[in-house]
Amino acid sequence: MPGHALRTFQEMGMYGCPRTAKSLNATMKVLLRARMFDEALSLFEEGPEKYDVEVDDISCNTVVKMFCDMGDLRAAYRVMQGMERAGLRSDVITYMTLMAAFYKCGRHEVGDGLWNLMRLRGWVPTLATYNVRIQFLVNRGRGWQANEMARKIYVAGIKPDEITYNLIIKGFFMMGEHEMAKTVFGAMHGRGCKPNSKVYQTMVHYLCERRDFDLAFRLCKDSMEKNWFPSVDTINQLLKGLMAISKDRNGKEIMKLVTGRKPSYSYGEMKVFKDILSHRKTGR
């Protein structure tokens, strides 16, 4: 498929179809998803001369993302610098992509610098860029600061989304602030944001770790009834916990929902679930 997309772009001229930045960008994105980095970079570099197509800001942002995925952050930053020399203005997406990459590899001073540079150049942060900052704070164990940032963006008229709340909840759980995590989860509804499958997964996982199996059961059941199933490991942990506190009936309810899942779990996974329940019955 990626090779076919590349050939189609290369042969467009043979069929009287003019190549455009839009067709170049579409081809590059297909190559990027297939992790065909060399081919995507060649297309970007050869575009203006070989194919008579001028790259645009989307082309550059695609290459920035590619270098970030490759772990070559210096090259990614150079692409942003090259944009300005070419008369193209780096945008919020450029900065967000770079910030996320630098934060992820622990170079927070560069990430903070990019944030400040973005603001100085007149770009208004989007929710996605705020989420990148919140992710960084959570990873650094600064859950309270992450929560404060979420509060500020809400006051500023930017509505936090499921990603924001999931990060804040995870941040509080990681700090041991379990009650705050549950408070944030409860506050989602009041602020017009319903939890999605990832939020449920986070809640059930950490509640099981804290051995709050009653609430974990209720949330897991609610999630499964929406056809959102936590990870196999989380379900295993919940079933073991319910059996340990003699909540056999709750375990059976979870098992009933698990059995009705489409697509179904594998034979091996189902066997593990059943074994957990049977161990309680046999006293093992």
Briefly describe each language-model feature range.
Residues 221-229, 239-246, 253-264:
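TPR/TPR-like (Sel1-like) alpha-helical repeat modules
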Residues 5, 20-25, 29, 40, ...:
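Pentatricopeptide repeat
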Residues 8, 43, 79, 114, ...:
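Alpha-helical solenoid repeat scaffolds, predominantly canonical TPR units
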Residues 1-57:
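Leucine-rich repeat
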Residues 16, 35, 51-52, 71, ...:
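Inter-helix linker motif
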